[in-house]
Regions:
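Carbohydrate-binding surface patches
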Residues: 199-245, 252, 256-261, 308-313
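Short, charged beta-turn/beta-strand-edge "cap" motif at the junction between a beta-strand
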Residues: 316-319
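Structured core elements
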Residues: 59, 103, 139, 219-222, ...
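Histidine- and/or cysteine-centered catalytic micro-motif in compact active-site loops
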Residues: 63, 106, 143-144, 223-226, ...
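Aromatic/acidic polysaccharide-binding cleft in carbohydrate-active enzymes
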Residues: 103-207, 214-215
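Acidic, Ser/Thr/Pro-rich beta/coil linker or hinge segments at domain junctions
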Residues: 243-304
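Generic recognition of flexible, low-complexity loop/linker segments
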Residues: 45-47, 89-92, 125-128, 143, ...
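Noncatalytic carbohydrate-binding groove/subsite architecture in carbohydrate-active enzymes
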Residues: 1-126, 133
C-alpha cells in the first residue's frame, strides 16, 4: 500500500496504527518465538521488508475511563502513570525512537461532564504527562457542542446555537494554551519535574510540569488533586550546568482555575425523571483568578488551592 500511495502522492506521510484506548501494549497470537506483542511484530515486519522508513508517525487514542468508568475522585491520581505505562510499553516493544507519536483522540469521557471540576484537572495532568513523555502532539475529543449542559461536550449551547456557559475542560484549555504555554506557535522547552506532596497512602497529590517559554519566562503548571485541602509549596530549579538550585525571583504571576472558580448547581429533578440527570448550571463558570507573588529565594511559599490547576510564571534569579 505504501508503494502504491507514494507512487501517486510521493510526500504523503504514512503512519498508524491508531490504537483505540488501550491501557497497555496490544497482544496478538504468539509467533514461533513466543512474541505476542502486536507492536513488536508490526515493526519487525516493516524492518524485515525494508519498509520501516515508510512509517513516519505512531498514533493512538486515550480513554482511560471508557471501560471502567472513573466515578471516584482518586482515579485522578492514576493518570500520569497511565500515560507513562502505555508509552513505555510501546517503546519497549519496538517503537523506534526517531518515530514521533501522537495521541489523536482522547478524553476522560466517563466523568467528563460539566458537573464537576475533576475533568479539568484530568485534562491538565494528562497533557502535562503526555508531553513530558515525548509526544509530538495531542488532540482533544470532542469539540462538538452539546445541548445537554451536563454532558461531555466542549461547550454547551441552547436551541439557537448560542453558548450558554463554559465547561471545566474549556476553561482548563484556556489556562493551558493562554497562560502556561505562549505563544503556542513557537517552540517551548519542557523539563521533567517532580513533587513530594503525597497523602498517607503514597498518592502524589500535586503534579508539576515546567516550561521554559520563548519569552524567557519559566512557566510551571501545577495540578493540586487534593479535593479537600490547599497546599503551600516551595519550587526549585535544578541547574545541572552550575551544579546548584535556582529559584523564582521578583514578581511571579499566578493563575488559578479550580473548585473556587467553577461550581455546579444541579437542577431539581421531578420524580418521573430520575434517569434524566445532567441538567443544571455553573455559577461561577470562570474566569480563572489572577494574582502575583513576590518571590525571594528558596523559602518562598506558593499557595495551591484545593482541586485546582495553577500556573506560576516568572523569571528565576542567580541566588
Amino acid at each position: 500500500f505504501a508503494k502504491a500511495i507514494h507512487k501517486r502522492v510521493p510526500d504523503a506521510p504514512l503512519g498508524g496504527p491508531s490504537y483505540e484506548g488501550t491501557p497497555a501494549d496490544v497482544d496478538s497470537w504468539a509467533d514461533a518465538n513466543g512474541r505476542a506483542s502486536f507492536t513488536r511484530r508490526f515493526f519487525d515486519y516493516l524492518r524485515s521488508h525494508g519498509r520501516l522508513d515508510d512509517f513516519t508517525f505512531f498514533s493512538f487514542e486515550h480513554y482511560p475511563c471508557l471501560d471502567r468508568g472513573c466515578p471516584e475522585w482518586a482515579s485522578l491520581y492514576d493518570e500520569p502513570e497511565n500515560v507513562n505505562r502505555v508509552i513505555q510499553a510501546w517503546k519497549d516493544n519496538g517503537l523506534p525512537p526517531q518515530v514521533p507519536f501522537f495521541m489523536t483522540e482522547g478524553n476522560d469521557l466517563r466523568d467528563g461532564g460539566a458537573g464537576t471540576v475533576k475533568p479539568a484537572l484530568w485534562l491538565a495532568d494528562y497533557i502535562g504527562a503526555i508531553m513530558t513523555a515525548g509526544a509530538g502532539g495531542t488532540y482533544y475529543f470532542h469539540y462538538m457542542a452539546s445541548q445537554n449542559r451536563g454532558s461531555g461536550g466542549f461547550l454547551p449551547i441552547d436551541d439557537n446555537g448560542r453558548v450558554t456557559s463554559y465547561t471545566p475542560q474549556y476553561l482548563a484549555t484556556q489556562v493551558i494554551t493562554k497562560e502556561w504555554a505562549q505563544p503556542v506557535d513557537a517552540a517551548h522547552k519542557l523539563f521533567k519535574a517532580a513533587s513530594d506532596v503525597r497523602d498517607e497512602a503514597g498518592h502524589t497529590l500535586v503534579t508539576a510540569y515546567a516550561l521554559l517559554r520563548p519569552d524567557g519566562q519559566w512557566s510551571v503548571l501545577l495540578v493540586n488533586k487534593d479535593r479537600d485541602y490547599d497546599h503551600a509549596v516551595t519550587i526549585s530549579f535544578a541547574d545541572a550546568d552550575a551544579g546548584r538550585e535556582r529559584f523564582f525571583a521578583g514578581t511571579v504571576e499566578r493563575v488559578v482555575f479550580g473548585a473556587a472558580e467553577y461550581q455546579w448547581h444541579p437542577d431539581p429533578l421531578p420524580a418521573s425523571d430520575a434517569e434524566g440527570g445532567g441538567s443544571g448550571h455553573a455559577d461561577p463558570d470562570g474566569p480563572p483568578s489572577r494574582s502575583t507573588v513576590r518571590a525571594d529565594g528558596a523559602a518562598t511559599l506558593f499557595q495551591l488551592p484545593k482541586a485546582s490547576i495553577i500556573v506560576l510564571r516568572g523569571r528565576i534569579g542567580d541566588q
